């Protein structure tokens, strides 16, 4: 499709969704699913913002993945229905269990450390009504814990979704995204903690659905308080996710799987800096550059570790397996 046609289509979808917001009925028939593991400090706020939607959800399900803290009790007190995993399922498996238990026509995934905009479900419903090809709706990600490491996590991991106009996406993080159940079909999450949302989005898109980014939806990420150690660990996990998804799926960056030596050029770092500069964040980009480079180094380490582990598994796998 030509760029001019794509731009026109984006504008038409955005205009139709704005009209539909005003005409939305006072019910969403959405099941909000929140996977949770040891999130007692943030889960109550996530549940409360889900219940406080201008278009109330049908239910809020918290899937407790063997927490060792008071997450279940806190979520119950906040008004959620808590379902406990009988064994460790990871974030992907917890979401699968939530989908199996949910009764809504819309499946709204929310992370346990997110405070969501009160118009989240209303705007998603409006987009679905305006364009039947839309399978999922995400929004603008905001760092809820300002500071060096919170900013670094936002820019390195979510720079694609921090601003801009309404547009089509190839994927969207499950920290706050609404899917139509009929668009999901048999798709399910890999039972892992990284890359599972990308695999899920790709499976839904393979069925013909499309993912819409609505910047009017505000997703406030109240992630754990990061320090240098946890920041490094998160970026290594992000590198693992990059390897696993690019190995299996046709996504931007697939060339890195085929030619990992290109990682030495730090391609993702330059993309992040370009997005920051395009949004006028010159001073912040310069201030954070050494830390952004360190985080990108950790991502490369994670990518290469996952690649090495994958190659070792292939070598050790018995013939015919």
Ranges and model annotations:
Residues 48-57:
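Short, acidic, metal-binding catalytic loop of nucleotide-sugar glycosyltransferases
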């Amino acid at each position: 499709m030509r760029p001019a046609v794509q731009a026109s289509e984006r504008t038409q979808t955005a205009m139709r969704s704005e009209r539909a917001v005003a005409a939305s009925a006072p019910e969403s028939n959405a099941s909000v699913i929140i996977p949770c593991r040891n999130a007692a400090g943030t889960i109550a706020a996530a549940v409360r913002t889900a219940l406080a939607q201008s278009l109330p959800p049908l239910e809020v399900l918290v899937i407790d993945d063997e927490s060792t803290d008071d997450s279940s009790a806190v979520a119950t007190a906040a008004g959620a229905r808590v379902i406990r995993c009988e064994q460790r399922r990871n974030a992907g498996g917890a979401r699968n269990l939530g989908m199996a238990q949910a009764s809504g026509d819309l499946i709204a995934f929310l992370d346990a450390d997110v405070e969501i905009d009160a118009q989240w479900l209303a705007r998603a419903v409006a987009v679905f009504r305006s364009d039947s090809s839309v399978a999922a709706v995400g929004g603008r990600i905001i760092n809820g814990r300002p500071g060096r490491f919170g900013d670094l996590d936002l820019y390195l991991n979510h720079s694609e979704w921090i601003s801009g106009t309404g547009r089509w996406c190839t994927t969207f993080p499950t920290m706050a995204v609404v899917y139509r159940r009929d668009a999901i079909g048999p798709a399910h999450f890999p039972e892992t903690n990284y890359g599972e949302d990308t695999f899920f989005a790709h499976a839904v898109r393979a069925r013909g659905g499309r993912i819409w980014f609505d910047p009017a939806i505000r997703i406030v990420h109240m992630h754990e308080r990061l320090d240098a150690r946890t920041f490094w660990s998160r970026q290594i996990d992000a590198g693992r996710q990059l390897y696993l998804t690019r190995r299996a799926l046709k996504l931007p960056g697939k060339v890195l799987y085929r030619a990992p030596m290109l990682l030495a050029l730090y391609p993702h770092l330059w993309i992040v800096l370009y997005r920051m500069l395009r949004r006028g964040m010159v001073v912040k980009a310069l201030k954070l550059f050494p830390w952004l480079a360190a985080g990108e180094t950790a991502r490369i380490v994670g990518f290469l570790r996952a690649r090495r582990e994958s190659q070792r598994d292939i070598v050790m796998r018995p013939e015919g397996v």
